[in-house]
């Protein structure tokens, strides 16, 4: 049986509430040398094949107080690992831990200067000076702190811009640290995944590629063959390149032209796969 990457490296679980930035959170964490996996927000922790060192709750377009809005597995709150909620994720923390969330007086969208409170310097905002510029994108806001939480940062219009329960290592941000508009966003994420979660930042894309190639060889075996459909898009092209590097001509790629490709795109995809990536294209 092939080994999963998440069992070899310290792994952060990112729960996706439908934010346009969810994949960007994943990218930013991996850029820090920490492996992470993006899963639907409804995933059951008991179904995971790994034990995460920390959990990040993404933003999302819903309101936590509305019927039908997505919520995490209740086991998240007793799992015992650090949690970081971003935007909707902060509101999800408050909604589940006896805080209060309400519609804001107006939507906040764009850059804002955040003032750090005294409790901030020893945790999520270590090494960051006040004020710091962040990127807001929200309509709802926290109106009452959950039990055991303190304010870490605020703005004139958002008194609970960042909150934390320092004992339980649960933190919430009403802004997006993953976007480049947040000046020290990468440092905040590093403080969480490395400083608070204790993850080793020893993962890299090169090591991931080498690992996946060996995993493919283990699964396929010395004499096995694989047939795969490719479209020329990023996902199928990366998969084809990995399979080709792993098992050579024992991977048989079939280019699928569904009639909806752009002018000359099928020919360009064929050239890229056959000539540049040396994929065994049928």
Predicted features along the sequence, with ranges:
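RNA-binding accessory domains that recognize and position tRNA/RNA substrates
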Residues: 1-57, 61-72, 77-82, 91, ...
